[in-house]
């Protein structure tokens, strides 16, 4: 009797730890994806579609039918280029609407973290501005 109670408590704690680890993993994953999109944006010519594809597929021109990393799609990525051609030229890459499912049956449902964004100054990549 006591061992079944302890086993249930252990399983609840274990699944809770796994869910927390999953949240941390996806937080880091999305943070790194927007960072890589911002890095791509500052060293290449500005192309919002290519930047969104780098974030979602890790490739500026993915093959047709390619699925995004962990369900991420280019439509979840927004790219903003502000103050173009000035010293305060910035690129903002943002991911919104990403949905993840919990492992735990008690937290069944969809969790939408974020939004995640990264802003980077455009350096010009050696081009005259």
Features from the language model and the residues they span:
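Short, conserved structural patches
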Residues: 35-129
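Alpha-helical assembly-interface signal, strongest on the long, hydrophobic N-terminal helix that forms
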Residues: 1-57
């Amino acid at each position: 009797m006591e061992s079944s109670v302890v086993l249930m408590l252990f399983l609840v704690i274990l699944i809770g730890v796994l869910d927390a680890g999953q949240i941390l993993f996806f937080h880091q994953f999305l943070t790194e994806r927007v960072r890589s999109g911002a890095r791509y944006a500052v060293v290449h010519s500005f192309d919002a579609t290519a930047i969104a594809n780098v974030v979602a597929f890790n490739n500026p021109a993915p093959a047709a039918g390619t699925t995004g990393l962990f369900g991420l799609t280019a439509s979840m990525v927004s790219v903003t280029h502000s103050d173009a051609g000035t010293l305060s030229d910035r690129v903002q890459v943002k991911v919104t609407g990403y949905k993840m499912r919990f492992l735990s049956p008690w937290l069944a449902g969809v969790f939408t973290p974020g939004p995640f964004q990264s802003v980077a100054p455009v350096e010009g990549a050696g081009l005259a501005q």
